[in-house]
Amino acid sequence: MVMVKKNGSMNLIISIMILTLCSTRIAADGFIPESFSPPLLISGDDFVLEPLGPRLVEIDYIAYMSSIEHLQRTFSRGGSWPNDSITREDAMIDMQTEQGRFEARESFAYAVLDLDREVELGCVYVYPSKKRGFDAMVRLWVTAAEYENGFDEKLYEWSKNWLENDWPFSPTRVAFPGRDISWEKWDLLSEKSD
C-alpha cells in the first residue's frame, strides 16, 4: 500500500523507512516459524493469489487506481489511499518494498488475480499483529467492480479458511479488523509490549 500526499515523494520514502524498521523489529520476535514456507502461488475457486512484486506493478496500479473512491471508503481508514497523485514510479517502489518484506518474512502481501493472472481483483495482506491476543492481522480489498459482484465477502470467507488451514496460526489468534472485530474494538485492544 502506498500512502502519498501531493508532492509527497519524500513522505513516501520516510513512510517506507519507518514501516520497514517497525516490521523488522516485529519479525525478530518470530512472526512465523522458521520451518514455515509462506505460500507462493495459491489457487482459489476462480482466482489465484501471487505475492506482490515488480512483475505485478502495472496490473496492481490499474486495479487500485480504478477504485480510488471505493477503496478510500472500504479499505483505507484515513481515506488517503489510494489517491490520484500516486505515480507508476511510486507503485514500483511499493512493489519492491512488499517483495522485500515477503522475502524477509516480515509481512505477506498477495495480489488476487483472475485465473489467467492478467487482471487483479484485489489484495490480501497478512501482517504480524501489534495487539495482544493475536498473532496475525489480515486486511483485504477488492476493486469496486468486484465488490459489486459480491467478491468481497467471498474473498473474506476464503481467506479465513486459507489462514486456518495453510498458515501456522490458531484461528482464534488471527484478526480481520473491520470484519470479524470492529475497528473501534481493535483500537481499544492493548498493544504488545516491547
Where are these regions (language model features)?
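GNAT-family acyltransferases
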Residues: 28-146, 158, 162, 166-194
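N-terminal signal peptide c-region/cleavage motif recognized by signal peptidases
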Residues: 22-23
